[in-house]
């Protein structure tokens, strides 16, 4: 018979896989290079940062995206259940309860803000409007045909945020990468 610790480990792995499907972790891995590219550009331009900032940027990016995806799944749960393309999402099937999604989203948002706090003051202050933009997309798509501009803006924050994490300020040189990402999505 399986031991309790074996069952607990299997449940933990199963739950992690469900949450990874909820936030489409593969898309997080696809989008992360935009933030990492900004760190490389900041390094080339002379910003002084180290492994600590790199790891905090990766953690902040992952937490912010998880919060945004969790919020979007909560907002769209009823729509997703009726849509053939999205009806099998864990949020639509009930595999994850709305309460659990809310807790996950809140924890992810808190982790993002905490990472931003430990990076620098500018990142911490900007983490709140960044979350507003990330969460705003979930409702913008219901009220405007320009929702892709909202999504483009949300995604373009990653390189700008990484630059600010590396240098402590926003520099016009990073706006080219953020702008390309914005217009590439929008």
List the model feature ranges, each with a label.
Residues 37, 41-75, 85, 109-117, ...:
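Membrane-embedded alpha-helical segments that form the functional core of polytopic membrane enzymes
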Residues 24-42, 152:
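The first (N-terminal) embedded transmembrane alpha-helix
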Residues 34, 159-162, 183-186:
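Hydrophobic cores of alpha-helical transmembrane segments in multi-pass inner/ER membrane proteins
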Residues 6-7:
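Short, positively charged and aromatic/hydrophobic N-terminal segments
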Residues 12, 17-21, 89-174:
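Intramembrane alpha-helical segments
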């Amino acid at each position: 018979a399986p031991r309790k610790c074996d069952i607990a480990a299997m449940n933990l792995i199963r739950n992690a896989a469900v949450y990874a499907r909820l936030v489409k972790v593969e898309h997080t891995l696809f989008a992360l290079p935009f933030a990492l590219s900004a760190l490389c550009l900041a390094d080339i331009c002379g910003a002084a940062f180290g492994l600590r900032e790199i790891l905090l940027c990766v953690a902040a990016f992952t937490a912010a995206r998880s919060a945004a995806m969790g919020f979007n799944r909560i907002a769209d749960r009823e729509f997703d259940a009726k849509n053939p393309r999205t009806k099998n999402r864990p949020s639509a099937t009930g595999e994850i309860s709305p309460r659990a999604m809310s807790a996950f989203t809140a924890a992810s948002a808190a982790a993002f803000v905490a990472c931003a706090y430990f990076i620098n003051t500018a990142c911490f202050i900007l983490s709140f409007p960044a979350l507003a933009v990330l969460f705003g997309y979930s409702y913008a798509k219901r009220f405007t045909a320009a929702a892709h501009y909202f999504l483009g803006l949300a995604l373009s924050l990653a390189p700008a945020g990484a630059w600010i994490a590396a240098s402590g300020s926003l520099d016009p040189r990073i706006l080219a990468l953020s702008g390309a990402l914005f217009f590439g999505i929008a």
